[in-house]
Structures are given as C-alpha cells and as structure tokens.
Amino acid sequence: MNADRSSSFATPTRRPVGGPAPWSRCALPLTLALSALLAGCGGGSGGEPNEPTPPQPPTNGTPGGSIGESQRISAARSTATNNAACTAIAPFYWEVGDRNAARVSGSVNRAGNSTVYTADSFMPLASATKWLFGAYVAELRAGVLTPQDVRHLTFRSGYTSFSFCLPGQTVDGCLAVPASNGAFTTSTDGRFFYDGGHMQKLGSLVGLGNLNNGALATEMRRLLGDDVAISFSQPQLAGGAQATPADYARFLRKLLGGQLRLGALLGTQAVCTNPDTCANALATPVPRTESWSYSLGHWVETDPAVGDGAFSSAGAFGFYPWIDATRSWYGVVARDAAAGSGNESANCGRLIRKAWVTGVSP
C-alpha cells in the first residue's frame, strides 16, 4: 500500500484504521443531473490554491422546489433497495435529511446475512474522521483559519509519510512512533498529497499533542457538541474516530444549519487533486479518469463529467457521508465492511442523492 498511495484507497489490514490511503478506490461512473460546480486545477507551484466559488446555501424557506416529498422518498427508497450499485453493498443503513431532521431512512439487508445496520449501529468512520477534524479546527479558530491550517487541511503541508497510530498512544506519540509519521518531505511541500500526516501534525500544532483516545474525543466533542458522540480507537485525526450514523447525521445537520462554522466554508480553499491534470498534485486516491477537488478536510465532487459538486468524506470501511452542492440536504450510507469499501458506498450514495434531488430513481 505504501508503495503506491496514489492509485488505490485500499488499506492492507482491518486494524489499525487509516494509514496513508484510508478509503477504497473510487471509480464513480455515474453521470449526475446537477451541473458540475467549482473549477478543477489551479495555482502555480508552491502558491495558494485558486479557490472555486462554492454554491450558496438556501436563504429562506424549506428546501425542496417543485418536487414533492413523497416523490423524493419513493425515488430514494427505490434506489437504495433496488439499484444494483446499492444491493451489491448490502447490508447497510442509509439516510437523507435536511438541517432539521432526517426525511427518509432505511436498513437494506442481505439474505443469509444476519447483520442489520441502523441509525444506532456503532462503527469505525475511517476517513470520515477528516471532516470532523476540519470542523474542529474551524471552531477552534472561530471560522478564521490561518494559512498553516489551510495547508494542512488541504493536504499540502509536506507531511506525507503517515503509516498508523497505536491505540495507547497520544497524538504526539503517534507522530513520534513510527518515526515516518512526523517526517517532513520538502519535495511534497505546497503540493496536494493525500496522506494522514498533514492532520496528525496539525493536531499537534493546535495543542492536541498530549491527548490520548479518551481525552481527544472529549476535546472534539467540546467544540462539535456532546450530541456528536464520537470516540477514538486510535488518536489519529485523519482516520481514528468511531460513531453511529445518528451521531454523524447530527454533525451534518449542524453544518447545514450553521451551528458549526465549517458549514459556511464548505468547498472553500479547494485545490485540484489529479496529477494528470494539475501540476500541483502528487498523490490522490481518486482514479485519474476523474478530477475532484479537496477542501478543508472534505472532498468536493467536482469532476466535469460525473461530479455534482457534493461535499463528502468516504471512509475505508464503507461509511460515506455527504452534503449536496446547494447545502440543502445531507445523507449517509453506513456499514462496517472490509477495508477498501468506500468506493462502493460512494457509488450507491451518489445514486441515492441523485434520486432524492431529482425525484427520479436512476
């Protein structure tokens, strides 16, 4: 895995969570109805990114347009239970909602498999942790990020040799052992390189270095809210959190509702990530047939052919949270599967999102 971080999201082992490329390869062939938002590449060598203009959130009323809720529910439910991309990943739990509450949800089961996932199923988040940490830093800075924060949260800091954390370590302990975790690489500084080292180093820089799993979870909840009941299996800021879909959905609703400052910053400071189309990109887990952007601890699905501008942060074991480009809706696809399952969850989740937004099952 360490030999080729740019070509696959897969992690070689079930535990520890994370590592340098913590979710599965994301070949997403779906053409979505919404127009692609935000530009792809930008910026010269070593400079700040060209910042795409994020979509504006709705200013009043309840989102929905002319499509009736019953039509949306029917389309989303049909997609989750019948579309081949979704039945292939069963069992899983899914949910779509707005800033106030869930609007539709369900458990899709598999014959012969006794596992049933619900909103209260506790599971590893893997790279979905990144979105939480981005929101934590935004709260810590009262919404005004420093240039150093931005470089670390958009994976351009030069800390690009992360391997794993051990459960009993602190944040700083993980930076020290294995030694590669805290290594700075001059040749990657200022260029996009998908790796957990950026966030681990930033965690130390913002004062989290002495915290172990329990203390880290307490501190994150202090700013994100105790109702976002995350815990940590290892003190890794890019991939060590655990939670239920219900907990993560509360986090997404807070982003939509403006209770967390990152909600207003979604998609900002985004950088190009495809080395084939962007001179400032070195390593990405997204297939090079697609060009996504990376914002402050979350992806922006901006590929001009198949992207819809949604914000997301898929995890290695199949947890896929998203917010749509208009910042009207959120969703989750949640399961605890083998390492490398983020791709399949994203494929299903994008279809459910399209069904909800358009009212038509793909």
PLM features: residue spans?
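Active-site-proximal loop and beta-strand segments within enzyme catalytic domains
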Residues: C86-A90, R99, S105-G106, A111-D195, ...
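Structured C-terminal helix/loop/strand segments within mature extracytoplasmic catalytic/sensor domains
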Residues: G61-S74, G307-P362
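Bacterial signal peptide processing site
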Residues: G42-S45
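N-terminal secretory signal peptides that target proteins for export/translocation
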Residues: M1-W23
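Penicillin-binding protein/beta-lactamase superfamily catalytic region
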Residues: F192, G207-F311, A316
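A short, well-structured edge-of-sheet supersecondary motif
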Residues: R72-A119, Y320-D324, S328-R335
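N-terminal low-complexity, Pro/Thr/Ser-rich intrinsically disordered segments
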Residues: P49-A85
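C-terminal motif of bacterial Sec signal peptides marking the signal peptidase cleavage site
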Residues: L37-G40
